Amino acid sequence: MRSGVFSFCKAIDTFCPLGPWIVTPDEIPDPHDLAMELRVNGERRQQSHSGRMSVTIPQILSNFSALGYSAGDVLSTGTVSGVAGFKSPEERARLYLKPGDVIEAEIEGIGVLRNPVVSWQEGHGTAAPPRIRPWGEDV
C-alpha cells in the first residue's frame, strides 16, 4: 500500500492520543495566539506559535464543512514546522521515534500531552504488519 498523503499515517489505530482532558473553545480567548512546543526525551524538536500555522482554524472548518460537525467533535490542526519527515536522511535516522522515547506536546493555556512510544509488538501483542513504502519507492 502506498500513500502520498502525509496525514494518512496519523489515521492508524492508537495514533491520535487525546487527553487527559479536552479544553473547550470558550477557554481559549484566541487560538491563533498560543505558544507550541514538542519535546522528545526532553529535547526540544519543534517550537513555534499557533499564529504561524499555514492554515487557520476558520479555513480548516470551511474546507471540511461538507462533512458536517456535531457536538463533541475534535478539530485536529496539524503541527508546527520541524517534523522529522522533511529532514535529510541522516537527520531522519536520528530523529524518527523509537520504542522507549517519550513525547511531550505542549500548548500554552492547554497543557502538556505526554506519551511513551512502544513497539507494535508491545502495544498489540502481535507481529507488526508490513510497512507502507515511502513515497516514490516502487512496490
Predicted regions and their residues:
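Catalytic-pocket segment enriched in acidic/His residues
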Residues: 1-139
